[in-house]
From Swiss-Prot:
Pfam families: Crystallin. InterPro entries: Alpha-crystallin_N. It comes from the Eukaryota. Belongs to the small heat shock protein (HSP20) family. One of its GO terms (molecular function) is structural constituent of eye lens. This is Alpha-crystallin B chain. The lineage of its organism: Eukaryota, Metazoa, Chordata, Craniata, Vertebrata. May contribute to the transparency and refractive index of the lens. Keywords: Eye lens protein. Homodimer. Aggregates with homologous proteins, including alpha-A-crystallin and the small heat shock protein HSPB1, to form large heteromeric complexes. The gene is CRYAB.
Amino acid sequence: LIRRPLLSFLAPSRIFDQTFGEHLQESELLPASPGFSSFLMRSPIFRMPSWV
């Protein structure tokens, strides 16, 4: 059995394979839908922390 992350529908599975400290392309973090991605970027939960 292959276990998939709960939020795999929101983000590519590659994100969950990253080791801490690796950089991701911004395009990989954003979903395909432009309307949904603009909602995510406005949401304070999904903003990048200042220490990144």
